C-alpha cells in the first residue's frame, strides 16, 4: 500500500531524475480488499495498487457517480427529440457531466432566457417522471444507487460530532436543485449540508467553479480535497480546481477516463473505504485501484486554460512554507523537453511556462527551464531557484576546470 505525504528534500548537488521502477504488481486477489484491511495485511510489496490518502473534504459528482438515472435520461432526450432536431447518439456520448442549461443551449439552440428556463424544468421533470414509470412497470429502481455508495457515505458521516457538526463531504452536480433535490431522496441517500447544483454557479463543469464552491462550503482547501467523478468533463473540472481526482468506471470506459489522467481510478466506490482521522482532522481514504494501475498519476495543471492560474500545493510558489500536502508529487508525466504550449510544469502560469511559445531563450531563462525540468522529473520540492542556479554555476565551473586541466596535460 502506498501512502502519500509531504516529503522533505535537501539538495546537495543537482537533483537527478527519479528512475527507480515500481515493484511488479502482485497477482489479483478478488475479495481480498476488506479482509486485508481488517487483518492489517496490506503491504507495499503485495498491494502496490492500494493507496492511502488523507484529505480535508470529499466532493462527489451525482449522476453516474452516486446514482444511475441513465434510462430515465435517455427517455427525456427522446421526448425532446420530438420537438428539436437532435443527434441523440452525439448528445448521450458528449453531454454527460454538463449542466442541463448548457446542454440545451448547445444542442437545442435555445437562446431566449425565459424559454431556456422553462425547458430546463421540463427536461428534468421528464427525467423524474420517466424514472417513476420505469420503477412502476419494471419493478426496478428508476434511479438506482451505484455499488459501494451507501456504505461510503455512511462512513463519511460517522463522527461528525468530532468535526463541530461539519460533514466535510458535498455533492457538486450539474443538475438543478429542482432535480437533484428530488433524485437523492428518491434513491434513499442522505442529502448533504453542502449541495452545489447548476443554480449555485454561473459557470458549470468543466470550469472549476462547482468544486471550488464545494470545498469552500466544507471549510476545506480545494488543494487538500478529493473530487470523485465518472465523466471526462467532471474530471477536468476537478483537476482545474486543484483537487486530487478519483475516477469511477461507472458510466464511461476506463480508457476514456484514463485519457484525462485522474490521480486515482476504481471500478466503483465499493473499492473505497473511509474513516475520520481525529489526529489530523482529515478523512483517511483507502483506495483499491485495478491491479495494473498501481502508480497514480499526478494531476496535470490545466488551470490556466480554464481559469486564472492558482497556486497549487505542489508548485514552487509554496517553497519554504511548512504545510502538509496530500498531493503525490513523485511522478510527473512530462519534462520540459516534451512540453507544448498547452502544458505547464508544477503549476506555473501559461505565460511563464518553460517550453511555451515565445519563451525567452536567454541563459537566465534556460537555467530556470532546466530547474523546472529536473525538479518535475524527480518529483521533489523545497529547492529554491537561486540555490539551483548556484549549483548549476558550480558544476559549470568544475567542468571548465576539468577541461582546462585536460588541455594542460595534452600540452
Swiss-Prot record:
Example GO molecular function: sugar-phosphatase activity
Binding-site positions, Mg(2+): 61, 63, 338
The UniProt record lists the keyword Hydrolase: yes
Modification after translation: Phosphorylated.
EC number of the protein: 3.1.3.-
Catalytic residues in the record: 61 (nucleophile), 63 (proton donor)
Keywords on record: Hydrolase, Magnesium, Metal-binding, Phosphoprotein, Virulence
Disruption phenotype: Decreases virulence in mouse intranasal and intravenous model for infection. Sensitive to: high temperature; sodium dodecyl sulfate (cell wall stress inducer); Congo Red (cell wall stress inducer); dithiothreitol; Calcofluor White; salt stress (induced by KCl). Simultaneous disruption of CRZ1 results in phenotypic enhancement.
Keyword Hydrolase attributed: yes
Ranges of biased composition (kind: Polar residues): 14-23, 326-345
Ranges for region Disordered: 14-33, 296-386
Pfam families: Hydrolase
Biased segments, Basic and acidic residues type: 362-373
Alphabetized InterPro entries for the sequence: HAD-like_sf, HAD-like_SPP, HAD_sf, PGP-like_dom2
Superkingdom field: Eukaryota
Family: Belongs to the HAD-like hydrolase superfamily.
Function: Probable phosphatase. Required for cell wall integrity and virulence.
Name this polypeptide is given: Probable phosphatase HAD1
Native source species: Cryptococcus neoformans var. grubii serotype A (strain H99 / ATCC 208821 / CBS 10515 / FGSC 9487) (Filobasidiella neoformans var. grubii)
Gene designation: HAD1
Amino acid at each position: 500500500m502506498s501512502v502519500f505525504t509531504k516529503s522533505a528534500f535537501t539538495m546537495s548537488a543537482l537533483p537527478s531524475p527519479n528512475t527507480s521502477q515500481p515493484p511488479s504488481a502482485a497477482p489479483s486477489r478478488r475479495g481480498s480488499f476488506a479482509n486485508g484491511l481488517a487483518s492489517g495485511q496490506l503491504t507495499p510489496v503485495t498491494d502496490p495498487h492500494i493507496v492511502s490518502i488523507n484529505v480535508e473534504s470529499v466532493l462527489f459528482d451525482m449522476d453516474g457517480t452516486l446514482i444511475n438515472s441513465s434510462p430515465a435520461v435517455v427517455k427525456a432526450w427522446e421526448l425532446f427529440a420530438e420537438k428539436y432536431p437532435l443527434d441523440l447518439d452525439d448528445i448521450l456520448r458528449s453531454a454527460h457531466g454538463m449542466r442541463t442549461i448548457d446542454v440545451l443551449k448547445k444542442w437545442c439552440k435555445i437562446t431566449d432566457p425565459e424559454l431556456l428556463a422553462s425547458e430546463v424544468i421540463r427536461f428534468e421533470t421528464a427525467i423524474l417522471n420517466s424514472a417513476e414509470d420505469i420503477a412502476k412497470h419494471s419493478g426496478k429502481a428508476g434511479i438506482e444507487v451505484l455499488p459501494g455508495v451507501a456504505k461510503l457515505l455512511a462512513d463519511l458521516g460517522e463522527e461528525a460530532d468530532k468535526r463541530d457538526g461539519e460533514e466535510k463531504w458535498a455533492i457538486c452536480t450539474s443538475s438543478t436543485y429542482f432535480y437533484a433535490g428530488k433524485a437523492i431522496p428518491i434513491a434513499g441517500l442522505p442529502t448533504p449540508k453542502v449541495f452545489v447544483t447548476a443554480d449555485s454557479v454561473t459557470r458549470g463543469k468543466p470550469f472549476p467553479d462547482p468544486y471550488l464552491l464545494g470545498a469552500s462550503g466544507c471549510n476545506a482547501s480545494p488543494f487538500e480535497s478529493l473530487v470523485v467523478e465518472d465523466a471526462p468533463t467532471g474530471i477536468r473540472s476537478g483537476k482545474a480546481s486543484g483537487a486530487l481526482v478519483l475516477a469511477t468506471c461507472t458510466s464511461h470506459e476506463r480508457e476514456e477516463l484514463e485519457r484525462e489522467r485522474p490521480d486515482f481510478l476504481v471500478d466503483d466506490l465499493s473499492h473505497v473505504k473511509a474513516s475520520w482521522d481525529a489526529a489530523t482532522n482529515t478523512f483517511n481514504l483507502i483506495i483499491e485501484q485495478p491491479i495494473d494501475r498501481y502508480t497514480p498519476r499526478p494531476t496535470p495543471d490545466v488551470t490556466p486554460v480554464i481559469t486564472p492560474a492558482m497556486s497549487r500545493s505542489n508548485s514552487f510558489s509554496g517553497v519554504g512554507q511548512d504545510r502538509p500536502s496530500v498531493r503525490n508529487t513523485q511522478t510527473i508525466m512530462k519534462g520540459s523537453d516534451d512540453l507544448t504550449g498547452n502544458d505547464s510544469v508544477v503549476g506555473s502560469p501559461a505565460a511563464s511556462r518553460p517550453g511555451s511559445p515565445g519563451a525567452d531563450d536567454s541563459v537566465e531563462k534556460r537555467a530556470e527551464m532546466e530547474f523546472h525540468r529536473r525538479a518535475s522529473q524527480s518529483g521533489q520540492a523545497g529547492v529554491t531557484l537561486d540555490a539551483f542556479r548556484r549549483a548549476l554555476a558550480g558544476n559549470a565551473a568544475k567542468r571548465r576546470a576539468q577541461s582546462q586541466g585536460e588541455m594542460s596535460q595534452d600540452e
